[in-house]
Amino acid sequence: MLAAIVLAARANGETLPQGLKVVSLEVRPAAVELKHRFDNRQLLVLGKLDSGEEVDMTRIVKQTLQGDAAIATPEGNVRASKDGAAEITFAHENLSVKVPVTVSGTTAPKEVSFVQDVQPVLSKAGCNAGTCHGSKEGKNGFKLSLRGYDPQYDYRAITDDIAARRFNRANPDQSLFLLKATGAAPHVGGVRINVGDPYYNLLREWIVQGVKLDLAKPRVTKIEVFPTDTIIARPGMKQQIVVNATFADGTTRDVTREAFIESGNIEVLEAAPTGVVTTLRRGEASILVRYEGSYAATTLIVMGDRSGFAWKETPTNNYIDQHVYKKLQRVKVLPSELCSDDEFVRRVTIDLTGLPPTSEEVKAFLADNRDSKTKRDELVDKLVGSHAYVEHWTNKWADMLQVNRKFLGEEGSIALRNWIKDAVATNMPYDQLAREVLTAAGSTLENPPASYYKVIRDPEGLMENTTHLFLAVRFNCNKCHDHPFERWTQDQYYQMAAFFAQVGRKPDQSFAGQNIGGSAVEGAVPLVEVVYDSGAGEVTHNRTGKQAPPSFPYQQQLVAANNAGGRREQLAQWITSKDNQYFAKSYVNRMWGYLFGVGIIDPIDDIRAGNPPSNAELLDALTKDFIESKFDVQHMMRTICKSRTYQHSVKTNDWNFDDTLNYSHAIPRRLAAETLYDAIHLATGSVTRIGGAPVGFRAAELPDAGVSDPFLDDFGRPVRESACECERSSGMVLGPIMKLVNGPTVANAIADPASELNQLVATEKDDSKLIQEVFLRFLARNPTEQEIKLSLEALKGSATEHAKAVAALAEYEKTIPAK
């Protein structure tokens, strides 16, 4: 006989915020089919508002369960009870929707799988976490693989240790495996599950069935998260996340309760173990979901009160603006106005050349009466590919390729930098640059990209650096175990490293006996080496002790390890393929980050599921354009800088002052160390003097960080010992700030008697013109009338103070006794 059970599903007093009116209800899935006694589904009740937005009503609606075939929780989770049918009605005010539930298979034995059922429970209970038995040494003599990445190891650890004392098959409830987890036996980890709950019953059934191992069971191939990229109307509201897993045999399962759901920004929202997300303030945050080695992510937008917002149609310059404004309209943010012409000439010149514009360049640009877009586009075309552009972007690539005399010697550093400079100057296609680096052979002096294999000398290090540099993927985390936050496995780590196992090096006999390095820590290596493919050498897997065959982690399989061209050639073809989802995307994201100060994916060299793009459609469009342009870097530079988005003002409005993710306004940035150094000397018209470099050398022209300068080091110049963008710092701390006020670099540039600034002071009698020139040199704009007035007053005051100081010194001199 069917029983009627009514549940008031207003957990923790959750209610709909005032002012929101629901006009319809929808439940996903619309019908539930449970096929065994451990089966469950997480329902998601969505309410459509009169504004067109959707809200999660799962815990707000009144829930009525008709029938005893299923059990429903107030949070919307439905579990099997016995074979039969049931119906759940969800109601809110005068709205209601019914969900039929069909239950079968509860009387038949359900084979409990160690791989598919037990391992996920152990993970969810925290047993194999890094703070518990998944730590390097385990806990209390019991160790599991971290987050269950090695089921076979875990099974043996659980069943074989100490003569299988953890199981009592005659009386499963007295198994130490269950007694410790429920707190019935002493357990430092405390209570992890409760007697009689679904997890307890499942583990108990596994013991009853004989504690079997089933490594052949299909594994998870992907997980999907619902809802995707949703908007939550108000801070304080909640959203249920639902996770479905697909297995290798095509079957699917609701794994919401077993999945790990985490917030990417705990200031915007927080996630509960049940998958319910609570919003805290207006903003955006990624939701990272992981389940049994599979990862997925989505983005939640917390809208907040946007009463009075009205979208204003804004002109667009290219597809970039179309994608940016589409997102801004969705999140109810208005873009800033365009920056002024003087702001633009300064911004684009610094970004593209690493130098500020000269006063003459500023005056010429401001005096040009043509349409602003026309002259801005023309300036971009002029700067891209210029000599200053080449030096600036050569320096960027010298960072990434680790041009460092510590590894290469002075000759090698200069040679590699010159090769990079030629590549930038000729606008070498990006895929060609990557291929030439990855396949380089011969003398490191005669073929400088071969120095890549001189800087990094082991297969594992080469693999980690290469995936980081050209794919923005951090493979180093899966060396000792499967990646804890990504899909990459330990097997893939060694299989990828195998592509570099046959890189050979031998001394270049033209430089016999000349070495670099050599210490108690590091051995000396030949100054110049010949890089070649040896045809021999393998990588040994750390866990298995066996040789790892070369294989790609996604897309395609290696046909044969000894294929024509060798392993590095095959790897280069795979990495630079237009079908490689990471190659082009990672570099356009870098370019965007360099020009905007923040990447669409940020950090700009960290692409992973838990770090989704702030605007996926924009990133896809940029990637597509880059590929279709045949990896033309200068084309992408022009496209980005000509967009209206790049030209937004730093001045915010009432609707975008709190936006940091969607490029609705420009974000002020601290200049990089080399740019700041060069800007100081260009603005003052002084000559640079860097020890070990020719007089007048730009900081951006220095071959490497081995040319020492305290100013550059204080302001975060990278040491070039890794490909990580984190080597360069752009923060503002007191020490460097004080050096801008009274440090020797600034002081010497100002005091240089031969500087253009000092000559101007000596020859220009009109103080107003002098002030105008100073503003143009340092700020790339004309001063306002008020600024001229205040500056004139300051000049007069300084002259008076100077006269007083001279007079005081003269009086003091009279008091000094004559010798």
Model-found features: residue ranges?
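Extracytoplasmic soluble-region selector
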Residues: 10-124, 133-140, 144-145, 152-155, ...
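Primarily short, surface-exposed interaction patches in extracytoplasmic proteins
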Residues: 312-388, 393-692, 718, 726-727, ...
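Short, glycine-/polar-rich solvent-exposed loops and beta-turns at beta-strand/coil boundaries
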Residues: 136-138, 194, 218-219, 337-342, ...
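Bacterial N-terminal signal peptides
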Residues: 1-8
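Catalytic and ligand-binding motifs that coordinate phosphates/metal ions
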Residues: 682-714
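Short basic-aromatic helix/loop recognition motifs at nucleic-acid
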Residues: 165-169, 608-611
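Signal/transit-peptide handling
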Residues: 592-595, 698-704, 713, 736-751
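Sequence context surrounding c-type heme c attachment/ligation sites in exported
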Residues: 100-155, 166-174, 183-204, 213-216, ...
